[in-house]
Amino acid sequence: MDNKNWSDRASASGIVGKSLSEFICDDVTRMYVATMIESVRVIPHTSFRPYRCDTPDMKRFMQMIITPEDNGWIRISHELLRIEPLEKPVTFSTVTEFSPLRQCKNNQTIHFVRCSICNRLQRYGNRDNTWYEADSLIARSHALSESLKVIYGVCLDCLDKLR
């Protein structure tokens, strides 16, 4: 899709003019993105940040480019670097009704924490900082008949890259 078509679709969908934070579903990722943007504001430089934006059957390796503008604004653009097929398709369902006590309000079972940056998964409640690629984790378990229920966060590897 070219930039003109994307701009038209984004405008028609009400995306343009909204705060970036409205599209981020968890506090940790929201703070991560705010820190990236603020670092470019404080020390004007272009920052290149790799991330993943997968589909159910493809790993999409992307790069976010954060650039300060002369007028004080920040330009954020995205570039697709490469695509790889997943070994097995996997879908996710975001659990959004989540209390501070880590219990779902609507009785959904949370399976994993999904890193918003690299898309790796950590079993929910696991404290050993082991994160897995979705397709390798699924390949070792049964075939999935439903979406994996996840909450989002940022793994320590991705947090370390922010420094």
Model-identified regions with their sequence ranges:
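PAS-family sensory modules
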Residues: E38-V42, E69-R163
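Sensory/regulatory domains in signal-transduction proteins
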Residues: M1-T94
